[in-house]
C-alpha cells in the first residue's frame, strides 16, 4: 500500500497523463509527495512539529500500516513499553478486553468465536514466535503443501528507490552511497554559519549550484560524471528525464518521489522548511529531488535494467501457520486434516490480527486508562466556587505542562489565582530586542507575525550599551576568525589554551559557582538600560510588516486575550503576565526547552508587551466602554518563569498602587518556598536521583549550569492532555506536570468563537508537541535524534550522528528515556478535555472540519465535561 493510494484522489487522476502533461504538473506531483515529510525548523529556533502533519486526512492506523510496509517503521509502542506500562498500572486489562471484543465484532470470519478469542488472547501477550518453530522443517514442509491464501497476494506499491535494490562489488547498498553524496550537497548548500567559504553559485539555487560543480566531483567515477555531463539546466527537466531513464511508470512517480523523500526525512524536511520561507527558494524541494534522482541514475545506470524492479510481494504463510500452532494450539496434524476453506479462514484471520492490530488495541487501552484516571482526578474534587478566598494577585502562565506544578504550589501558599493561556498572549508579533538588526517571530510557527515590535532606549544609554556589546562580541568573533584561518588556527591553541583549560576544569568541578559567576558577569556587563517598546503604529515601507499597533489593534488584542481566559471582571490589585524560559549550558536543544508558543524563544518579551498594553489609559478607556472595567489601582506586571530552576524573574514592574505593592510583596515572600517545592517535585523524577534533596533550588541551579549535564530538565515529556476550562475544574488536582492548561469560560463564549480559536491555535501547538514526543519515543531510530553525547551540530541547522548521517529531526534519547530500556515519556495521543455543554462541542466539530478530521482519524482524543460535571468521550 503506497501513501499515494491513501493521500488524495487527485493523485490517482494523474496516472493516465502523458509525459508532456506529467512535466507540466511536476510542481503538483512534488507538492503531493511532500506531504510524507514535515518541515524541519533550524535547531536554534527548535519548533515542535509532528512528522505526520501532512497525512492527517488518513487515519492514524492507515499511516501506521503504510510506514510499516514502506519503511519498516513501527509507530505503535513496542511490546517492552506496553509490558512496562501495564506493570506500573498505566493499562487496565478491562479496556483491552473491551477493545478486543469491539474488534472481533467488526470483523467477518467463519471460525468459532471461542477459537478466535482464544487465539487473540494468546497473541495479545505480545510474545515473539520462537525462531525454532519458524525454522522447523516440519512447519516449512506443511507450508509447501498448503496453497497461498486467496487474499494474501499483494503488490508492493511503495516503490522503493531503485538504488535500495542494488549492492555494489564492495557489498554496499547503493542507496547508502547515494545518501552519502546527497548529505554532502545538502550541507554545502544549507550552511548559513559554519563555513567562511560558501558553495559557489549558491545564490542561484541548489540545482544550478550542484549542476555547475557535479562534473568536477572527485567522489564520482568517470562514468558517473559522464552521465551527468550534458544534463538539463533546469530542475524540472532533469527530474523528468531521470525518472524516465530509470523506467518509473507515470502512475508510480508520486510513490517513487515519496520513497526518496523518506530516505533522508531530516534533510528533506529542512529543504521543505526553507522552501516555505521565501519565494526565491519555493522550488527547493523539486531541486532537491532533481539532484537526488539524477545522481541515483548516474550511480545505478550500469546495473539497469533490473529484472525485478517492482516485484509482487507475497504474504509468507509460515508465520501465519506458526501463530496458530503457538497461540491457537493447533498441531500440524490438525492442519492437514482441515479442508482448504478452513485453512484459508484461519490464515486470513491471523493475517488480519497482525502485530500492528495487536499493538493498536494495547495503545487504545493505555489511552482509555489514562482518560479514566484523569476523569477520576477531576471528578473527585468537589469545589465550592462561591466559597473562594480573597485573591490579591492573579498570574497568567503559559499552557506549557511545566507551568502546572508551579501554579499548584503557588496557589497553595497564598491568596493567588492563576490562569493558563498560550505564552505569546495572543500577540502576532515579531520581536526585535535592543540593538538587534534581526527580528524573531514570537508566536506559534503555524501563524505569521502581523506587527514588528522593537525595544527602544535613550540614545546615550543605548550607545553605552552598544559599546559593551561590541566588546563582548569582538572576543567571540576574533576567536571564530582565528579558528577558520589557516595560519592563525595553528596559533590559537597556544593563545587560548591556558584560559580555556582553566574554564574546563572549573566548569567541570564547580559548575554552579562558575556558571553563576559567568552569567552574573555577562549580566552586569551587558545590563540593558531602561527600555520601552515601539507600540504605536509606524508606516515604514522598508519593513515587510508594520511597526507597532493602531489604537484599535491594541484594544482588540487585549480584549481577545482577557476574554479567552475569562478575566473580564473581579480584577485583583496585581495581574502578572508570566512568560517562560529555560536555562541550560552547552545544550544544542536549548530552544526546545523555551516557549513553543513563541517559536522557540523565551516568552518574556510578549508578556512585557501585553502588560504594557494593559496599563495604557487609552486601552482601559476603550475596554471600559465595552463593559470590561479594570480598576484604577489594578496594575499589570510581567515576569518570566524559568522552568529549569522554577523561579519567577520580574522583567516589568511599573509603579504600583498600595494594594498592588502589598500583593507584590506577598508573592515575593512565598516564592522561595514555591521554588523549593516545585524543584523538589521535578528533580525526584530525574533518573538516578533517588537521594533525599536537602536544597532542591541549589541542586536545580547545578543542573542548569553544568555543561556536562545531558538532561537539565525533562521539558514537556509525559505530556498527555490539554484541558480547556475554568481553573476550578483542576484546582488542587495533582496533574503531575502532564497537562496543558488553558482557561476557558463557556458562559462568555455564546457563539463559540473563543473555543474555536483555542482549538485552532494552542490546541494545534499542543498536538504537535505531543506527537513529536510520541514519535521520538516509539521510533527513536527514525524520528528521534539519538544520543546527545555523540551528536554533531551541523551548519547551524541541526544535529547529526557523525558527519554523514541524516539531519536528525526529533528529540534526543535523553528527552524521552529514563534508561536504555525504560521510557520516561508515555507515548499517548493527546487527550483534549473541554469544559462546555455538549452543544458547544457539536458546534465546534460541525464548524471546524480540520479538527473533526483529527478526532475521527485518531490523531487526537476528545472528551468534554458539561456544566453538571458529566464526562463524555467523543
Swiss-Prot record:
What keywords sit in the KW lines? Answer: Cell membrane, Membrane, Metal-binding, Transport, Zinc
Superkingdom in the source lineage: Bacteria
What is a single cellular component term in the Gene Ontology annotation?
plasma membrane
Q: Which residues are recorded as binding Zn(2+)?
A: 398, 400, 580, 595
Record's bilayer topology term: Peripheral membrane protein
Q: Pfam families, alphabetically?
A: DabA
- Listed cofactors: Zn(2+)
Where is this protein primarily located?
membrane
Which GO MF terms are attached to this record? zinc ion binding
**Localization per record:** Cell membrane
Q: Which InterPro entries match?
A: DabA
**HAMAP family, per this entry?**
DabA (MF_01871)
Q: Which family does it belong to?
A: Belongs to the inorganic carbon transporter (TC 9.A.2) DabA family.
What's its job? Part of an energy-coupled inorganic carbon pump.
- Binding partners and assembly: Forms a complex with DabB.
Task: Write down what this protein is called.
Answer: Probable inorganic carbon transporter subunit DabA
Originating species: Bacillus cereus (strain AH187)
Where is the organism placed in the taxonomic lineage, from the top?
Bacteria, Bacillati, Bacillota, Bacilli, Bacillales
Amino acid at each position: 500500500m503506497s501513501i499515494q493510494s491513501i493521500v488524495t484522489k487527485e493523485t490517482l487522476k494523474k496516472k493516465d497523463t502523458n509525459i508532456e502533461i506529467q512535466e507540466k504538473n511536476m510542481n503538483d506531483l512534488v507538492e503531493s509527495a511532500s506531504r510524507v515529510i514535515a518541515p524541519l525548523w533550524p535547531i536554534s529556533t527548535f519548533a515542535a512539529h509532528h512528522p505526520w502533519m501532512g497525512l492527517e486526512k488518513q487515519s492514524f492506523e492507515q499511516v501506521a500500516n503504510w510506514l510499516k510496509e514502506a519503511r519498516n517503521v513501527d509507530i505503535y509502542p513496542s511490546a517492552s513499553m506496553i509490558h512496562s506500562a501495564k506493570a506500573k498500572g498505566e493499562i487496565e486489562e478491562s479496556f483491552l478486553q473491551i477493545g478486543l471484543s469491539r474488534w472481533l465484532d467488526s470483523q467477518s470470519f467463519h471460525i468459532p468465536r471461542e477459537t478466535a478469542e482464544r487465539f487473540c488472547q494468546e497473541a495479545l501477550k505480545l510474545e515473539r514466535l520462537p525462531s525454532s518453530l519458524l525454522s522447523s522443517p516440519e512447519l516449512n514442509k506443511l507450508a509447501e503443501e498448503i496453497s497461498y491464501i486467496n487474499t494474501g497476494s499483494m503488490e508492493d506499491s511503495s516503490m522503493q528507490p531503485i538504488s535500495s535494490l542494488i549492492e555494489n562489488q564492495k557489498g554496499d547498498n547503493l542507496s547508502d552511497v547515494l545518501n552519502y553524496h546527497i548529505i554532502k550537497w545538502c550541507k554545502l548548500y544549507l550552511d548559513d554559519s559554519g563555513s567562511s567559504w560558501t558553495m559557489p553559485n549558491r545564490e542561484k539555487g541548489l540545482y544550478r549550484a550542484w549542476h555547475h560543480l557535479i562534473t568536477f566531483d572527485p567522489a564520482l567515477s568517470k562514468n558517473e560524471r559522464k552521465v551527468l555531463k550534458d544534463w538539463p539546466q533546469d530542475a524540472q527537466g532533469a527530474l523528468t528525464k531521470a525518472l524516465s531513464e530509470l523506467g518509473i511508470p507515470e502512475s508510480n512517480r508520486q510513490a517513487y518521489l515519496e520513497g526518496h523523500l523518506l530516505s533522508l526525512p531530516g534533510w528533506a524536511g529542512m529543504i521543505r522548511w526553507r522552501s516555505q520561507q521565501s519565494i526565491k527558494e519555493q522550488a527547493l524541494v523539486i531541486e532537491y529531488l532533481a539532484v537526488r534522482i539524477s545522481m541515483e541514475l548516474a550511480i545505478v545506470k550500469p546495473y539497469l535494467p533490473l529484472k525485478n524492479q517492482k516485484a509482487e510481494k507475497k504474504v509468507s504463510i509460515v508465520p501465519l501457520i506458526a501463530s496458530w500452532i503457538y497461540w491457537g494450539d493447533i498441531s500440524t496434524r490438525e492442519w492437514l486434516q482441515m479442508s482448504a476453506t478452513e485453512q484459508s479462514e484461519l490464515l486470513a484471520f491471523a493475517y488480519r490480527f497482525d502485530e500492528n492490530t495487536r499493538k493498536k488495541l494495547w495503545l487504545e487501552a493505555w489511552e482509555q486508562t489514562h482518560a479514566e484516571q484523569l476523569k477520576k482526578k477531576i471528578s473527585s474534587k468537589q469545589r465550592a466556587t462561591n466559597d473562594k478566598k480573597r485573591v490579591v494577585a492573579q498570574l497568567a502562565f503559559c499552557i506549557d505542562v511545566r507551568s502546572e506544578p508551579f501554579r499548584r504550589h503557588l496557589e497553595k501558599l497564598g491568596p493567588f489565582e492563576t490562569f493558563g493561556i498560550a505564552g505569546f498572549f495572543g500577540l502576532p508579533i515579531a520581536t526585535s530586542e535592543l540593538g538587534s538588526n534581526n527580528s524573531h517571530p514570537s508566536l506559534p510557527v503555524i501563524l505569521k507575525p502581523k506587527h514588528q515590535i522593537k525595544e527602544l532606549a535613550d540614545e546615550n544609554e543605548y550607545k553605552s550599551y552598544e559599546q559593551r556589546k561590541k566588546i563582548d562580541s569582538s572576543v567571540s568573533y576574533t576567536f571564530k576568525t582565528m579558528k577558520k584561518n589557516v595560519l592563525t588556527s595553528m596559533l590559537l591553541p597556544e593563545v587560548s589554551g591556558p584560559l580555556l583549560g582553566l574554564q574546563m576544569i572549573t566548569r567541570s568541578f564547580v559548575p554552579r559557582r562558575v556558571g553563576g559567576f559567568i552569567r552574573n558577569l555577562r549580566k552586569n556587563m551587558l545590563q540593558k538600560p531602561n527600555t520601552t517598546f515601539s507600540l504605536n503604529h509606524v508606516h515604514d515601507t522598508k519593513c515587510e510588516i508594520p511597526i507597532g499597533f493602531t489604537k484599535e489593534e491594541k484594544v482588540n488584542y487585549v480584549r481577545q486575550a482577557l476574554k479567552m481566559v475569562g478575566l473580564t471582571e473581579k480584577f485583583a490589585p496585581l495581574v502578572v503576565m508570566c512568560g517562560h524560559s529555560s536555562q541550560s549550558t552547552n545544550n544544542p536543544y536549548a530552544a526546545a526547552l523555551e516557549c513553543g508558543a513563541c517559536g522557540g524563544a523565551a516568552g518574556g518579551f510578549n508578556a512585557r508587551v501585553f502588560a504594557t498594553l494593559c496599563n495604557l489609559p487609552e486601552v482601559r478607556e476603550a475596554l471600559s466602554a465595552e463593559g470590561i472595567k479594570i480598576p484604577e489601582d489594578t496594575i499589570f506586571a510581567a515576569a518570566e518563569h524559568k522552568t529549569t530552576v522554577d523561579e519567577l524573574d520580574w522583567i516589568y514592574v511599573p509603579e504600583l498602587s498600595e494594594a498592588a505593592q502589598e500583593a507584590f510583596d506577598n508573592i515575593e515572600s512565598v516564592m522561595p518556598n514555591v521554588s523549593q517545592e516545585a524543584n523538589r517535585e521535578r528533580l525526584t523524577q530525574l533518573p538516578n536521583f533517588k537521594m533525599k534533596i536537602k536544597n532542591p533550588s541549589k541542586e536545580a541551579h547545578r543542573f542548569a549550569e553544568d555543561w556536562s549535564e545531558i538532561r537539565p530538565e525533562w521539558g514537556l515529556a509525559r505530556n498527555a492532555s490539554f484541558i480547556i476550562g475554568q481553573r476550578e475544574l483542576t484546582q488542587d488536582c495533582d496533574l503531575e506536570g502532564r497537562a496543558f492548561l488553558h482557561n476557558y469560560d463557556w458562559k462568555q463564549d455564546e457563539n463559540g468563537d473563543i473555543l474555536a480559536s483555542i482549538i485552532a491555535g494552542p490546541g494545534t501547538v499542543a498536538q504537535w508537541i505531543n506527537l513529536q514526543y510520541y514519535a521520538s519515543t516509539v521510533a527513536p531510530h527514525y524520528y528521534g535524534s539519538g544520543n546527545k553525547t555523540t551528536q554533531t551540530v551541523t551548519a547551524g541547522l541541526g544535529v547529526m550522528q557523525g558527519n554523514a548521517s541524516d539531519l536528525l529531526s526529533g528529540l534526543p534519547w535523553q528527552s524521552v528515556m529514563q534508561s536504555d530500556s525504560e521510557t520516561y515519556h508515555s507515548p499517548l495521543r493527546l487527550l483534549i478535555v473541554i469544559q462546555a455543554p455538549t452543544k458547544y462541542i457539536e458546534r465546534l466539530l460541525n464548524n471546524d472540519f480540520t479538527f473533526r478530521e483529527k478526532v475521527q482519524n485518531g490523531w487526537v482524543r476528545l472528551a468534554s465535561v458539561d456544566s453538571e460535571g458529566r464526562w463524555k468521550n467523543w
